[in-house]
């Protein structure tokens, strides 16, 4: 009884340690993809926050063209100074196997100098693909996530007001031709290139479906032999995508975002022992205007403004800090926090660590 319990416990621990994931979570089917759509349109119904038509002539031109299509003629030379209209760009993604009559979400972004799109309504806008064919028509009320107010020359704003979203705001009018079901092979594409994972997925499919059913072509592509016909391939892919494979350890990687100052690392990152000295140099410039006036108000003279500039330079830190070898992510974070460096300083420290061979990871700067 004890032996059976220990065997079950060991099997549970081994199963837990080997992290298994479905093939559907690791790959995508080549050719089954989204397609981008774009369009140009008008938003009306704004509460005085639209384009200044004197500075955005394309808004007035678009409005005139739309009115003429509706049978309304605007006299030549009319200066329409409207504040409730804005020219916008509309973008959307056409999903794979999208059918006529289905709805998709659209994103609306101001093109001119409109202050806000809150409360606006997008007029019927054709959405085109790269082949200049119309695949969807967008129209509806815009939902803006930001908020803002202004009065007396002061203003406050939270989030973006010049862009919004229309849920189910476009109707698909044209379907994309699909090659699915044609031929006897399909390619599975890994989300991240990995020779080991590609071969492991091919071996898993071959064990279940028979030798020769799958072949790893490169670090990202696995070619699978499938039966002909749409319904047969759908059933075949449904079975394959639910197969589970053991996930190999990821590559150690540190990602640095220079724009936001953020540093992200995965659990495979390790450190070797090293010593780090980081000096912080700060320069402060203060500029002050001094006003000099004559003492005798009736004796002539002129008021003079003289600028006074003061520059302070401070350098702190610079002490040598020892960083111990760390084999786990928690220890790596603890060692880096012990340096007391800011995120911006940490970027240069990590780059120097990699150059010195102390950081066992790929460094990616975005």
Curated annotation (Swiss-Prot):
Role, per record: Assembles around the rod to form the L-ring and probably protects the motor/basal body from shearing forces during rotation.
Subcellular location: Periplasm; Bacterial flagellum basal body
Family: Belongs to the FlgI family.
Subunit structure: The basal body constitutes a major portion of the flagellar organelle and consists of four rings (L,P,S, and M) mounted on a central rod.
Signal sequence, renumbered to the chain: 1-20
GO cellular component, one term: outer membrane-bounded periplasmic space
Protein name: Flagellar P-ring protein
Key words, A-Z: Bacterial flagellum, Periplasm, Signal
Main location per the UniProt record: periplasm
One GO term (biological process): bacterial-type flagellum-dependent cell motility
NCBIfam families: PRK05303.1 (NF003676)
Molecular-function annotations in GO: structural molecule activity
Classification lineage: Bacteria, Pseudomonadati, Pseudomonadota, Gammaproteobacteria, Enterobacterales
Pfam hit, one: FlgI
InterPro entries, per the entry: Flag_FlgI
């Amino acid at each position: 009884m004890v032996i059976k319990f220990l065997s079950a416990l060991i099997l549970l621990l081994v199963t837990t340690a080997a992290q298994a994931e479905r093939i559907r979570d690791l790959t995508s089917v080549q050719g089954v993809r989204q397609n981008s759509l774009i369009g140009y349109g008008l938003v009306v119904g704004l509460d005085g926050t639209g384009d200044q038509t004197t500075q955005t002539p394309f808004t007035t031109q678009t409005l005139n063209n739309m009115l003429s299509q509706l049978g309304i003629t605007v006299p030549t030379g009319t200066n329409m100074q409207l504040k409730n209209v804005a020219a916008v760009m509309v973008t959307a993604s056409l999903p794979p196997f999208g059918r006529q009559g289905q709805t998709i979400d659209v994103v609306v972004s101001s093109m001119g100098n409109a202050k806000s799109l809150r409360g606006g309504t997008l007029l019927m806008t054709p959405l085109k693909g790269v082949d200049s064919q119309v695949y969807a028509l967008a129209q509806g009320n815009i939902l803006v996530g930001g908020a803002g107010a202004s009065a007396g020359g002061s203003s406050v704003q939270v989030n973006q007001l010049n862009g919004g979203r229309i849920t189910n705001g476009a109707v698909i009018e044209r379907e994309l031709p699909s090659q699915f079901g044609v031929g006897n092979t399909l390619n599975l594409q890994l989300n991240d290139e990995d020779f080991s994972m590609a071969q492991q997925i091919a071996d898993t499919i071959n064990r279940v479906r028979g030798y020769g059913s799958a072949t790893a072509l490169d670090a990202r592509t696995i070619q699978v032999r499938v039966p002909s016909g749409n319904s047969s391939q759908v059933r075949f892919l449904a079975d394959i995508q639910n197969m589970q494979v053991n996930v190999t350890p990821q590559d150690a990687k540190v990602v640095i975002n220079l724009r936001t100052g953020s540093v992200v690392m995965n659990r495979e990152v390790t450190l070797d022992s090293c010593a780090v000295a980081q000096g912080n140099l700060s320069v402060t410039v203060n500029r002050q205007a001094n006003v000099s006036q004559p003492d005798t108000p009736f004796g002539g003279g002129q008021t003079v403004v003289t600028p006074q500039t003061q520059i302070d330079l401070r350098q702190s830190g610079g002490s040598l800090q020892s960083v111990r070898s760390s084999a786990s992510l928690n220890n790596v974070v603890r060692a880096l926090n012990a340096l007391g460096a800011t995120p911006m300083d940490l970027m240069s420290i990590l780059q120097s660590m990699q150059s010195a061979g102390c950081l066992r990871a790929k460094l990616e700067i975005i």
